[in-house]
Amino acid sequence: MLGTSNLKVTALALVLYIPALALASDLPDSTLTPGAINPYVTQQNIHKTVCVKGYTKTIRPPAHFTNKLKKQQMREYGYADRNPKHYEEDHLIALSIGGAPDDPNNLWPEPRISEWNAKKKDRLEFVLYKMVCRQEISLTEAQHAMATNWIEAWKQYVPSHQHYR
């Protein structure tokens, strides 16, 4: 009996000391990545900022910044899969709808291998960008939809806007 008791205590100690690892989620952890907006982009200036062709290229942070941040955030998220190639360091609120370019609160390691992956989110980003620039939706409404739950936003907006290519 004493041996069984020691084994249980040892097993419990191992469980307590193993760092928590998580599977990547399709949605970011809202406490780690709540989203952040670019204060220089407003509804009044969208046709001079986000709606100008090539705008996002002028504000996108350099790869050395996002690659370093991706590795740091993968640890913070506790992802079990630590291969950086399996993630895209993505803006929760897209640059094309006024997301903050280099605020870590707006960046997260988004899974590439999943049903709701980075490619699907890119489609939503384009649809919301077109809707904002065509004034079908307000800038703040698009930002809120993306930050709150981008999967639900995809379901709401993408199927009804298939003509946006």
Segments from the language model and where they lie:
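Nuclease and nuclease-like effector domains acting on nucleic acids or nucleotide cofactors
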Residues: 2-9, 15-87, 96-165
